[in-house]
Design a protein with these regions (language model features):
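Acidic, Ser/Thr-rich peripheral helices and adjacent loops at domain boundaries
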Residues: 115-138
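Membrane-interface, cytosolic juxtamembrane amphipathic helix immediately N-terminal to a transmembrane helix
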Residues: 196-214
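Charged/polar helix/coil "stalk" or linker segments at domain boundaries
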Residues: 5, 13, 210-250
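Conserved N-terminal substructure of TIR/SEFIR domains
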Residues: 1-76, 94-102, 109, 192
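Switch/connector loops and helix/strand junctions flanking conserved nucleotide-binding motifs
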Residues: 16-18, 56, 82-85, 111-123
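Conserved TIR/SEFIR loop-to-helix hotspot centered on a Trp-containing motif
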Residues: 79-98
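N-terminal intrinsically disordered, acidic low-complexity segments at the extreme N-terminus
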Residues: 131-132, 136-202
Length: 250
C-alpha cells in the first residue's frame, strides 16, 4: 500500500506547471463509479507534486521518499522536459524502485521522441508473441495527450516561444485543460485503477447521466410544489374576493 497514488514530475515552466496542478486536482477529486468492475470504492486519492524547483541535480531525501511511496509516476512532457536534470533523475529513480509500466506520460507538446526524457524513450521490455517466442520491444508510455490542434499543427514554434504572448499562452493552456478534463483524466485514472479506458468512460458517463436525471427530478419536484402553492394561493384569493363581493352585495 502506497502513501501516494501518483507522483507528478514536471518542468517549472508554463504551461507545464498549470497542467500539473490540473492533473493533481482532477485525480484527487475523482470519484470512481461503483459499477467499474474489479475496483473497490475509493474515497480519496492522494498525489505528490513538488512545488519548488530543486536547487541542485540531487533529488534530496524528501523527493526520493515520495517517489518510493508513490504507486505511479506521471510525467508532464514538453519539449523542455528532456532538458531538466531533475525530471530525468525523478524518472530514473522511479525506475529503480518501481516497474516502468507504472509510469504515465502526459504529452503537452511535440512528439514523444522530442518531448520524452531519454529515460522514457530507451525502456525495453520482453513480450511473448502469439507464436510463443519472446521478443524485446520498446515500452510505450503515452497514456494521455493534451495537445490542442494548434500545438499539434506543423510549424508550432513551441511553448518557450509562445510564453512571450501571455494571451496566446492562456488560450492554449485552457484548451489543454479542457482536453484533460473531458477525456484524458479518464485515461490516467484507467491506468492507475488497472481498468480499461472504455470502462472508466462508460461508467463516468452513466454516473453523470444519473446525476443529471436526479437534478431534473429535483427541479421538477420544486416546480411542482411551486405550482401547487401558487394555485392554492390563487384559489384562496378568488374565494376571498367572492366572499367580499357577496358581503358588498348584501
Amino acid at each position: 500500500m502506497f502513501k501516494y497514488d501518483a507522483f507528478i514530475s514536471y518542468r517549472h515552466v508554463h504551461p507545464d506547471m498549470e497542467i500539473a496542478q490540473d492533473i493533481q486536482r482532477l485525480i484527487e477529486a475523482f470519484v470512481v463509479s461503483k459499477a467499474v468492475p474489479a475496483v473497490p470504492k475509493r474515497r480519496d486519492f492522494l498525489v505528490f507534486r513538488d512545488r519548488d524547483e530543486l536547487a541542485s541535480g540531487e533529488l534530496g531525501e524528501a523527493i526520493e521518499n515520495a517517489l518510493e511511496n508513490s504507486a505511479f509516476l506521471i510525467v508532464v512532457c514538453s519539449r523542455r522536459t528532456p532538458l531538466s536534470p531533475w525530471c530525468r533523475r525523478e524518472v530514473e529513480y522511479f525506475r529503480e524502485v518501481r516497474d516502468p509500466s507504472n509510469i504515465i506520460a502526459v504529452l503537452l507538446e511535440g512528439e514523444p521522441e522530442e518531448s520524452f526524457p531519454p529515460e522514457l524513450r530507451d525502456v525495453r521490455k520482453l513480450v511473448r508473441t502469439p507464436g510463443g517466442a519472446v521478443q524485446e520491444r520498446r515500452d510505450e508510455f503515452l497514456a494521455a495527450d493534451v495537445r490542442p490542434d494548434r500545438v499539434r499543427a506543423e510549424g508550432f514554434p513551441g511553448y518557450e516561444e509562445v510564453e512571450r504572448d501571455p494571451r496566446a499562452l492562456r488560450a492554449l493552456r485552457r484548451k489543454s485543460a479542457a482536453l484533460l478534463k473531458r477525456t484524458e483524466i479518464n485515461r490516467i485514472m484507467a491506468t492507475i485503477l488497472g481498468v480499461s479506458y472504455g470502462d472508466i468512460t462508460q461508467r463516468q458517463r452513466e454516473r453523470k447521466m444519473r446525476r443529471a436525471m436526479a437534478l431534473v427530478s429535483v427541479v421538477a419536484l420544486v416546480l411542482g410544489v411551486f405550482a401547487t402553492t401558487v394555485t392554492a394561493m390563487w384559489v384562496k384569493s378568488m374565494r376571498s374576493e367572492e366572499k367580499a363581493n357577496e358581503r358588498n352585495a348584501a
